[in-house]
Amino acid sequence: MIRLLLAVLLGVLALPTLAQDTMPPAPYAYNQLEDPRLEAEASALMHTLRCLKCQSQSIADSDAPMAGDMRHQVRSRILAGESPAEIRGWLIARYGDYVSYEPEVSKSTWPLFAVPVLVILVVAGVLLRRLGKRRNEGDGAGETA
Amino acid sequence: MGKRLWLWAPLALFAFFAGLAGYMLTQDKDEFVESEMIGQPLPDFALPAAFDGLPGASKADFAGSPKLLNIWASWCLPCIAEAPQLEALKAQGVEIIGIAIRDRPADVANFLGRYGNPYSRIGSDRISEVQLAIGSSGVPETFVIDAKGVIRYQHIGDIRESDVPKLLAELEKAQ
Amino acid sequence: MTAEIGLAALWLAAALAVLQMVSGAFALKAAPGEVNALAMHARPAAVVQAFLAVLAFAMLLYAFATTDLSLKLVASNSHSMKPLIYKLTGTWGNHEGSMLLWVGVLALSGGLLAGFEKRLPERTMGATLAVQGFVALGFYAFLLLASNPFERLPVPAPEGSGLNPLLQDIGLAIHPPTLYAGYVGLSVAFSLAMGALLTREVNPAFARVLRPWVLGAWVLLTLGITAGSYWAYYELGWGGWWFWDPVENASLMPWLAATALMHSVSVLAARDALRTWTIMLGVLAFSMSMLGTFLVRSGVLTSVHAFAVDPERGAFILGLLGLYIGGAFTIFALRAGAVAEGKRFAAVSREGALVFNNVMLSAILAIVLLGTLYPLLTEAFDVRVSVGPPYFNPASAIFAIPMLLVMAVGPLLRWRSDKPARLQFELALIAALVIGVIALVSFFGQFPLLPLLGLGLAAALAVAALLPLRGRSLKRVPVATWGMVIAHFGIAVALFGMACEGAFSKERLAAVVPGGTEQIGDFAVTLEGVTPVAGPNWTAIEARLAVRQNGGAPVILTPQARNFWSPPQSTSESALLTKWNGQLYAVIGQQAEDGRWQIRVWWKPFVTFIWYGGILVALGGLLSIAGRVSVDVRRRKATAQGDQRRADLDALGAAAPVPAE
């Protein structure tokens, strides 16, 4: 209990000065690359990487300092000549599939791709049953009606 | 009959979802993103000193014996809470190398003056470069690094008193 | 005192829900054509209940307006220094208040149904009211037992702890109430569908009763989603208008189901086909509303828009979900086989096109559901994955593109059976527009595939939407047809906005010294200065940006970076310059150590069309309701007059001649 109280007290005292870091953002966190083609590549990649400190936002949509540092990594690596796929791979090797909003077929994500195929089959089946067969019957019914 | 079976499909799908959701509600929501770098060697890095009192840190500093790599920052509140535990680990003879994330020398010195200094070296990572390279997603986090420089264990969040034996055991295992 | 009145009203309303449920169930016991004496209480119970639930909500509203800090809910979510409008909207900016709003709307719509709907057979009406009472009872229980909004504090708090600054916006006044009303409107569709299923009265008359509720709910959902999208767009500060976030998907899924339901109800009303399917969609649409509530409230999924989460309450809602939806699907599985097949139709016919649209909407719904819940599934195995736009966009487009193509043609087809040869000109026109626009745009540059397809489809759809009016006297076109035309045109407008935003947006991020200028597209943006400003419960730095288009006269934009002090949190207040052909979106960031300021500016061509389109779609829905209701009223008047005349003739005696019907 006393520890808790102490923690709360410390928190209150420390809050104004310590709640957030006051460091300026990394060079490429809020600055674009000179080359518009490279910047477009970086921007497309950043929109598909998850900000790890945020709730369901890409690093391209976040003001969290860590998202800024991740943007800096992406832009400086693109500038150094790495491909977006390499950078995504580098991050997945560190944070797992969680960091990428673009699921790739793997043993943990295959249903994401199998189910749509299944849905296509079901859709085709339903349409054939409901519309395909009806055409023949409908023609017959049309004549008698 | 085929048609009758089809009518049960929505219920079956719903039951599957309800079961899953019910199970997930009983689980603690895991907000941590674990590093995939466990078992991998530390990436190469060399960080400058975080303040005048201690040298900076590089990969070479982890050679020799198992050590702790503590990711922290002076602006991070849970880091205050774990300071006594780091002191306790140091008292047990554990060498702790710190990496200060997005920090200023004056703030680092001030923090260490107030809450104690358990570190042998502190590198300054102003743009979270090393943090990202080892798959850490927040402060504080603590990694066990063996004598060959391989990452063996990751502790996410502040170290509580109850976590100290676990960390000592992991250091032992990394011998 | 007000809180106690509110609480008492809630308990009374819950008791009336029991009465409504039991009394309604007795209607089922009546022999056909007769009325069970015990069934007569259901309607009054629903009406009085509506008054009580609305009263309870009004009491909470009052407590928030006066910042009654002896109430726990007010103390933990409000603050005396907040502007009045945010005090009021803050009533539903928290879990308990939003659930009370939900229940209030539920009771209100139940009351309206009981008070005004006289067309249904009494048995079906009784069953419907019983189901509605059962649903309401669950939510009263949830409020009273697990989230009492009227709980008092033992000692009144000296000050409230405030409202999340992201919610201190006019968006909170519009978005949640409309969305909730839409969710809840679907509960009436659900009750009606269950009532019809239980009494096997699935027929065009039932569909005509169901239709205004579905349309109404769908209009509200459309407006709610549109408002929510615009709100997120300007409030989150990065110019995104749709993130495929779980909470957004939770609002999209009921909309998709309701859209399918609305079209299938039309088929049932006009042609007595698709009976089982309509019932199924009625259950599905409300399931999606409840699922949405569950996902938002339980916090099982991580979302940027989740503001009040609690796993225990999640368990309660999951229980309700299991009870209602599990029960409904069970009854569906047992009963639906007994509902006679509806009328048949050819593949090339209005019905055929509507079935296609229904199946595609359901497929999109399946994809969104899968993508939303998949992370939950893998977390059960301790694997964390993220599913985002790179998945949702193409996966839903697979089904959306054929759907949009058929949507262009569908309204031109005749009911029952049609010949494609009759529509040669229209088909050629639509194909030419799709291909022509895509070819034209690709000629000017390289653009991503989906926006490109979107542009082609938008052009074709905009023209095709107006084709049903061709060769008709515009004055004689029924109001409901106008509704359809405008709604379909609205989809084209929204699609155009989305495609343009995706293909032609420009972004400029830069560190600027005061006095410095950045160029973006046709616009020169000059940072004239940065000044501190203060609001009632925040302080901020405000940038003065002078924007000149092609060297014209400057327009001043003032984006702010705000710091709220209760609770302590910072937000970016974007500044927007709206032109007819797009928006300039400006945000001020931090100051770098060298004194330069971070500014972010976007030029988003035609982005506003996304929301104009949404409004047009909703307007189309409104017109459709107006058209249907006016036809119904006229028909009822005519029937009443006929009855009156027949009664008069009877009174005149047997000598009078029998009028021809």
What are these regions (language model features)?
Chain B
Residues 68-69, 96:
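Hydrophobic beta-strand anchors of alpha/beta hydrolase catalytic cores
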Residues 113-118, 125-175:
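Thiol/disulfide oxidoreductase modules built on the thioredoxin-like
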Residues 80-116, 126-132:
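Structural microenvironment flanking redox-active thiols in thiol-disulfide oxidoreductases
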Residues 45-67:
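A short beta-strand-turn-helix
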Residues 27-28, 48-55, 122-125:
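Short gly/ser/thr-rich secondary-structure transition/capping motifs
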Residues 1-48, 175:
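N-terminal targeting signals for export/organelle localization
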